[in-house]
C-alpha cells in the first residue's frame, strides 16, 4: 500500500489525533496528496538544486525565510542582493533562507537547475537553493500549498502566489508567522526577525 493511500485511509484518525505516536501523522501527511494535515514546515521534503531530497526537518530550531525566485525578473537583483545580505548577517543567529526557483510568472526562470545554480553563484549565494518547482496550481509543491493556507500565510485578494519573490517567515517550530508580497524587499523582514530568534 502506498504512503499516500495509507494517509488518505487514516486521515480521519489523524485529524482527530487518534494516533498516539507524536510526529507519525506529520511524517505521513506531508505527501503530494495529503499536505493539509501537516502541522509544520518540518514535515515536508524537497529536492535541492542538485536534485538531492532534503527533509525539511533539518530546519527545526531555525528561523527561515522561504521564497520563490527567478533569474530574469525586474526584482531579481534587489531580492538576491538583500537575501544574501540578510543571510550573511543573521545565519549565525539561526536564520536560514530557502530559495525555490519558479517559472510560473512571466517565464522568468526558464533555465535548468544547473543554470540557476550558476546564476545564483554570481551573487555569492550561500543560502539553500532548491530545484525548480510550481508554487500555484495542481502541480504546486506541497510545502507551498500548505504555506498559503496557514492563518498567517494567506495573501491579499486570495491565497495564490502573485509573482516572483513572495516570502514566508517561518518560526523555529516550522510555523508560518508572516507572508510578504513580491513588492516587499527582503530587508523589510529584518524588523521582524528579532521576535523569533
Swiss-Prot record:
It is linked to Spondylometaphyseal dysplasia, Sedaghatian type: A form of spondylometaphyseal dysplasia, a group of short stature disorders distinguished by abnormalities in the vertebrae and the metaphyses of the tubular bones. SMDS is a neonatal lethal form characterized by severe metaphyseal chondrodysplasia with mild limb shortening, platyspondyly, cardiac conduction defects, and central nervous system abnormalities. Changing residue 73 to C: Almost complete loss of enzyme activity. Keywords: Cytoplasm, Developmental protein, Dwarfism, Lipid metabolism, Mitochondrion, Oxidoreductase, Peroxidase, Phosphoprotein, Selenocysteine, Transit peptide. One of its GO terms (biological process) is multicellular organism growth. PROSITE patterns: GLUTATHIONE_PEROXID_1 (PS00460), GLUTATHIONE_PEROXID_2 (PS00763), GLUTATHIONE_PEROXID_3 (PS51355). GO terms for molecular function: glutathione peroxidase activity; identical protein binding; phospholipid-hydroperoxide glutathione peroxidase activity; selenium binding. Its EC number is 1.11.1.12, 1.11.1.9. Belongs to the glutathione peroxidase family. This is Phospholipid hydroperoxide glutathione peroxidase GPX4. Essential antioxidant peroxidase that directly reduces phospholipid hydroperoxide even if they are incorporated in membranes and lipoproteins. Can also reduce cholesterol hydroperoxide and thymine hydroperoxide. Plays a key role in protecting cells from oxidative damage by preventing membrane lipid peroxidation. Required to prevent cells from ferroptosis, a non-apoptotic cell death resulting from an iron-dependent accumulation of lipid reactive oxygen species. The keyword Transcription does not apply. Transmembrane segments: none annotated. The keyword Ligase does not apply. Present primarily in testis. Expressed in platelets (at protein level). It holds the Pfam family GSHPx. It comes from Homo sapiens. One of its GO terms (cellular component) is protein-containing complex. Coiled coil: none annotated. It catalyses: a hydroperoxy polyunsaturated fatty acid + 2 glutathione = a hydroxy polyunsaturated fatty acid + glutathione disulfide + H2O; 2 glutathione + H2O2 = glutathione disulfide + 2 H2O; tert-butyl hydroperoxide + 2 glutathione = tert-butanol + glutathione disulfide + H2O; cumene hydroperoxide + 2 glutathione = 2-phenylpropan-2-ol + glutathione disulfide + H2O. Monomer. Has a tendency to form higher mass oligomers. Interacts with FUNDC1; this interaction promotes GPX4 recruitment into mitochondria through TOM/TIM complex where it is degraded by mitophagy.
Amino acid at each position: 500500500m502506498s504512503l499516500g493511500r495509507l494517509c488518505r485511509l487514516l486521515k480521519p484518525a489523524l485529524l482527530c489525533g487518534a494516533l498516539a505516536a507524536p510526529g507519525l501523522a506529520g511524517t505521513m501527511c506531508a505527501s503530494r496528496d495529503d499536505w493539509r494535515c501537516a502541522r509544520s514546515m518540518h514535515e515536508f521534503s524537497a529536492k535541492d538544486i542538485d536534485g538531492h531530497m532534503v527533509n525539511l526537518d533539518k530546519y527545526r530550531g531555525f528561523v527561515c525565510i522561504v521564497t520563490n525566485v527567478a533569474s530574469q525578473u525586474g526584482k531579481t537583483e534587489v531580492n538576491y542582493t538583500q537575501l544574501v545580505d540578510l543571510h550573511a548577517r543573521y545565519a549565525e543567529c539561526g536564520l536560514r533562507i530557502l530559495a525555490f526557483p519558479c517559472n510560473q510568472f512571466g517565464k522568468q526562470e526558464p533555465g535548468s537547475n544547473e543554470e540557476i545554480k550558476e546564476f545564483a553563484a554570481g551573487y555569492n549565494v550561500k543560502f539553500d537553493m532548491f530545484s525548480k518547482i510550481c508554487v500555484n496550481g495542481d502541480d504546486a509543491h506541497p510545502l507551498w500549498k500548505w504555506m498559503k493556507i496557514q492563518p498567517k500565510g494567506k495573501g491579499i485578494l486570495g491565497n495564490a502566489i502573485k509573482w516572483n519573490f513572495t516570502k514566508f517567515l517561518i518560526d523555529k517550530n516550522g510555523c508560518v508567522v508572516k507572508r510578504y508580497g513580491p513588492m516587499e524587499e527582503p530587508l523589510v523582514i529584518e524588523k521582524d526577525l528579532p521576535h523569533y530568534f
